[in-house]
Amino acid sequence: MESRPAIGINVQGGGSSAGVQACKSGACQIGMSSRELKADEKDLHEIVIARDGLAIIVHPSNPVRGATLAQVKQIFSGDLTNWKFLGGPDKEITVVTREEGSGTRGAFQELVMGTTRIFRGAITEDSNGTVREIVAHDPYSVGFISLGLVNEQVRALALDGVVGSETNIRNGSYKLVRPFLFLTRGEPTGAVKAFIDFVLSDEGQALVKKEGLIPVK
C-alpha cells in the first residue's frame, strides 16, 4: 500500500475455491472469493467489498439481443444448440465456459444452472479475459464473464428483458449478481483490519468502481 509502506501485500491467483482453502488452512491472512460461500465454508468470516454482475456475452455481429435465463440454462446444458431458436442465424452455438474452481463458474452454476451440469462439449478456459477473446473472434459463440469486463469486443445480452447495469443491479431487476468477498479466520485485526478498512473506505470504494465493480458503500 503506497500510503502505508510498512504493509506489504502479496496477491496470488488460483480461483475462488483456492482462496477459500488458503484462508481455511491459514496459508493466507485474507482469502478472496467472487461467489457466495458454500455451507461447509461458512466457518470463515466474510466481508463483502463489492458486487458484480455476470454478463452473458456474444459477438457484436450476432443479431440476438437478449435471452431468458431459462434459455441460457438450455444453451449451457447443451439442450439448445442453434442460434435460430433465439431468432439468430441457422448456426450451431459455440459454448465457452470457465474452469471448475473459478468463482465466475461457481456463481454462474448457482445463479443459472442450479443442479444441472454444464455440458461436456463446452470450451473451457481459465480466465474471463480468454473467454472474452474467444467470443470476440467467433461470431457464433457465447460465454459468461464479469460485467465489468465487457468491452467493445463483445456484447452483453439482455436477460429476461433487463440490461446489465449498475442501476439494474442496485434495484434488483438484473438477477445475475455475485459478491466479491474478503475472507478471514475470525474477526480481522492489526494490519489485516487496516487493509480491509481501506478497501471499504471512500478511497478504496472509488478504486473498486474504477475497476468496473459495484461499490457496497
Question: What do the PLM-derived regions correspond to, one by one?
Answer:
Residues 1-217:
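Exported/periplasmic ABC-transporter solute-binding proteins
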